Regions:
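Non-transmembrane, aqueous-exposed alpha-helical and coiled segments at domain scale
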Residues: 2-472
Length: 472
């Protein structure tokens, strides 16, 4: 099915222009009303108030560990031990339903098969599938990949945005209207919606990218029918490349990335957002859209693009990539806010939980190396490894005392670029993969927790006497 993108976007742009004019007109306000903009309090609260009231800022304890807000059987993100009340760094470990992530990835790769579907089944059901169960699950995913003509007629209008993550939110909310019982809260309905999301979101994300390209070119938007029997990784590459113009190695590496991003505990911002909404017993589409909105934030899911920009900056300003002293000196400039974006951050280094190692980063490094060599990108890959090795010492030299290790984002952007994935899809692919974890956590919150999440905020305001309007 094809749509005239130029016509669609012209209609939207005309509407947007009217909105901009209306907004500018609304800004023609009296000087007295400027307080509406300049009177907004933006000063941070006195640090002493947080200590006085024992506030767990960011739901973190004073030692940086997370406040325990619930129990889960879905995954374990381990990066330290607590001994005698103190945080003791440890090698990172990620287990999904009790299974080590390295074992899940390595076994799928050793058997030369795609593993994301197995991980999704494991997360949703709580057990590893046998071959018959896995084949049946993949068959159901294939059946759900199709987007109905009625949905596609509406969906192109939702693709008008500078952010594909914003498009995904609206696309997910639109699916509510095509569900016969969208507010049903039963295990059967939740599993059906989860499978629907796992199947459709990869194509929706890729289609949203194609629509934005069509807008720039003034061409039609084509919605190809899904090809039966393809894995999630193959489905994504098929839409992006307009056919099967990709290698098995490329699809297998993308599959590894999907597996590594599928789940990462209940306390990360997007999963917690999904659980917060689910605790109110709202519909799954609303909870999933909220999780996507959280992941869109640059403090959560948007770091991989920053890492790519930083790598490009380092390659441009370091003349000899093999000179460790020169690389370390430039990393020092970044920390001193004299290079790159001026934030003083080395992106891709450090994590809220992992201290000595991020197991996902180690898996990324292992599987990316061979494809980088095949694509003649070995020197760029070696530079990233050099950054990973040198950055912790450079950061210690700048006074940082906590253990620092590379996180998965250090390699993610490089891998996606190597696979030809456009930067605008980096975070959307994160969302595509994480839908498995979000779905599992939503069901656990709905059927095991049975209580709405409602923390408290301590008021730090003084009582005031009301003045009549004429006396102000």
């Amino acid at each position: 099915m094809a749509y005239d993108a130029k016509k669609i976007y012209y209609r939207f742009d005309d509407h947007l222009s009217r909105l901009v004019l209306d907004y500018e007109a609304s800004r023609q306000i009296s000087p007295e009303s400027e307080n509406l903009y300049h009177g907004l309090p933006t000063d941070p609260y006195d640090e002493g108030l947080f200590v006085e009231h024992n506030v767990k800022r960011g739901l973190r304890n004073a030692d940086g560990s997370g406040v325990v807000a619930g129990l889960t059987r879905i995954s374990d993100v381990h990066g330290y031990n607590k001994i005698d009340g103190k945080v003791v760094p440890d090698q990172g470990k990620l287990t999904l339903r009790g299974y080590n992530i390295e074992d899940l990835v390595n076994n799928a790769q050793a058997e030369n098969r795609y593993g994301y579907e197995e991980v999704a089944y494991l997360l949703i059901t709580g057990s590893l599938p046998n071959k018959e169960e896995l084949d049946g699950f993949c068959e159901r995913l294939g059946a759900f990949r199709h987007l109905s003509d009625e949905y596609v007629k509406e969906f192109p209008m939702t693709t008008v945005s500078s952010s594909i993550m914003n498009v995904l939110q609206r696309a997910v909310l639109l699916l509510y209207a095509f569900d016969a019982e969208p507010d049903a809260i039963t295990p059967e309905h939740e599993i059906d919606v989860a499978i629907s999301m796992l199947a459709r979101l990869p194509r929706i994300a890729a289609f949203a990218h194609m629509a934005s390209v069509a807008k720039r070119r003034g061409s039609e938007v084509h919605v190809p029918h899904p090809t039966p029997g393809l894995s999630t990784a193959e489905t994504i590459l098929q839409v992006l490349r307009g056919g099967m113009a990709f290698t098995r190695d490329e699809a297998m590496l993308l599959d590894v990335m999907l597996m590594l991003h599928a789940e990462h505990g209940g306390g990360n911002n997007s999963t917690f957002a999904c659980r917060v909404l689910s605790s109110s017993a709202t519909d799954p589409y609303s909870a999933d859209a909220a999780a996507i909105g959280s992941l869109k934030g640059p403090r959560h899911g948007g770091a991989n693009a920053k890492v790519v920009s930083m790598h490009e900056d380092i390659r441009a300003h370091v003349s000899n990539w093999e000179d460790e002293d020169e690389v370390a000196a430039y990393l020092g400039k970044i920390l001193d806010k004299q290079a790159f974006d001026g934030t003083g951050l080395i992106y891709g280094m450090g994590h809220a939980v992992y201290t000595l190692s991020d197991p996902r980063a180690e898996v990324c490094r292992h599987y990316a190396r061979s494809l980088a060599a095949k694509k003649d990108l070995g020197e760029e890959f070696a530079l990233i490894e050099r950054i990973e090795r040198l950055a912790p010492q450079v950061m210690r030299d700048h006074g940082m005392t906590k253990p620092i290790c590379a996180n998965i984002d250090l390699y993610t952007g490089f891998i996606y670029k190597m696979l030809g994935v456009p930067e605008t899809l980096f975070t959307p692919l994160f969302a595509v993969a994480r839908m498995a974890g979000w779905s599992a956590h939503r069901m656990e919150e709905l059927f095991c927790a049975h209580r709405i999440i409602r923390p408290a905020y301590r008021p730090v305001i003084e009582p005031l006497e009301y003045k009549p309007l004429a006396d102000r």
